[in-house]
């Protein structure tokens, strides 16, 4: 029996080594031209399908500009976009089939992404090349939704690394119902409203590291659906680590949490990042009818540059209401607790915290700021919070008072005008 197990183990290792050593499938061998004029959709898709049929491996796109419509990546497949190589989205909407997607927190029809994978394990997109989305005439579509750049749905152990993307007025990466996802070394550029960088939507186990994201809308947005159906589905976005990144939004926030958060957002860590936003560096946002929760959100070792607000909190927003809002005088509001930021350096920030748009019916519990230094014009404005902890707030250039509160309980509030 032991010999049999040893033989099986050796065979498994040998098979794995063989799979790893399979030569990459070159899309040119399947008819791709890479001339920037010919549509290479069929050829590239054939290479991807052949890779899956072979039990997995790599597909190589290199040395050219490859015009393509929507492509589907299967399990155990690595798509490599080599240096000095571009994938460019077609301008023909017929090249993006309509499927069921989650958009603005609810399920509806939408055009399939330029690159997509669905319910697939071990999908990787890598390489030093670039991915350019469809022109604005397509990305601005809303009914049905236009094609996002990359969309992973229900995938496990997916990795996106080292490439560059450019898009406008629609999301670059939408990661939905995924588990164990990594984005590493990406350079993401977008312009315009809805031009998010990475949207993490009801996912568990997300690492975003060493990325440079400069966007129109939120650089990174954490979501989990909106309304009673999303709350009952109970698929939170959780166990998220964002580290060693540069995040900038030219319209909204470097990191947005909500407003679509009815399934919950929890266990989020932002570490060793340089962040800035046109409105907020970090924006915690929701409204009545969302329900759900946000908890265990932390940031440490951050540099905040030239932002009107370091942390903005608006739980009374007028964002799009769900078709099935969560009912109840208290339950309709999100439960927000255990929010902490430590060792933060701010530079040319107008306000440290704008946190007064919070419902009295559901105060935020356990909000802490520790060791905040730098320059700001206005300080910390809080309302409807319990267990607030402020310590080591060493900023200069502000207009008094440093701390303004209304219906707030906690420690370190001595400089506030109200208790």
Model-inferred region functions:
Residues 6-16:
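Bacterial N-terminal signal peptides
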Residues 1-4:
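Positively charged n-region of N-terminal signal peptides that target proteins for export
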Residues 18-419:
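Extracellular/periplasmic carbohydrate-active domains that bind, remodel
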């Amino acid at each position: 029996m032991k010999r049999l197990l040893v033989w099986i183990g050796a065979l498994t290792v040998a098979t794995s080594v063989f799979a790893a050593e399979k030569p990459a499938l070159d899309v040119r061998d399947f008819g791709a031209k890479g001339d920037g004029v010919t549509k290479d959709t069929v050829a590239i898709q054939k290479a991807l399908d052949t890779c899956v049929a072979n039990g997995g491996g790599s597909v190589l796109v290199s040395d050219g500009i490859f015009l393509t419509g929507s492509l589907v990546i299967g399990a155990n497949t690595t798509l490599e976009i080599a240096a000095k190589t571009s994938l460019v989205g077609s301008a023909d909407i017929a090249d993006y089939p309509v499927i069921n997607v989650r958009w603005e927190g609810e399920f509806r029809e939408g055009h399939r992404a330029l690159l997509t994978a669905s319910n697939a394990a071990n999908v990787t997109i890598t390489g030093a090349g670039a991915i350019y989305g469809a022109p604005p005439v397509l990305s601005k579509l809303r009914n049905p939704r236009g094609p996002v750049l990359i969309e992973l749905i229900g995938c496990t152990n997916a990795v996106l690394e080292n490439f560059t993307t450019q898009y406008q007025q629609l999301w670059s990466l939408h990661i939905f119902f995924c588990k164990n996802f990594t984005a590493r070394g990406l350079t993401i550029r977008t312009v315009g409203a809805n031009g998010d960088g990475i949207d993490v939507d009801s996912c568990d186990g997300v690492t975003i590291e060493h990325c440079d994201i400069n966007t129109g809308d939120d650089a990174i947005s954490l979501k989990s659906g909106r309304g009673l159906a999303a709350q009952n589905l109970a698929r939170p976005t959780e166990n998220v680590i964002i580290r060693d990144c540069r995040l900038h939004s030219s319209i909204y926030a470097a990191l947005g949490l909500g407003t679509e958060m009815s399934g919950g957002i929890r266990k989020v860590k932002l570490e060793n990042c340089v962040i800035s936003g046109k409105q907020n560096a970090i924006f915690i946002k929701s409204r009545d009818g969302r329900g759900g929760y946000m908890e265990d959100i932390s940031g440490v070792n951050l540099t905040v540059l030239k932002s009107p607000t370091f942390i903005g909190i608006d739980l009374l927003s007028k964002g799009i209401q769900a078709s099935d809002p969560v009912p109840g005088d208290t339950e309709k509001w999100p439960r927000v607790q255990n929010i902490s930021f430590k060792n933060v350096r701010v530079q040319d920030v107008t306000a440290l915290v704008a946190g007064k748009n919070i419902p009295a019916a559901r105060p935020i519990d356990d909000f802490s700021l520790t060791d905040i230094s730098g320059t700001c014009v206005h300080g910390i404005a809080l309302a409807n919070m319990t267990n607030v902890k402020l310590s080591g707030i060493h900023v200069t250039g502000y207009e008094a008072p440093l701390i303004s509160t209304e219906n707030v309980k906690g420690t370190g509030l001595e400089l506030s005008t109200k208790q």
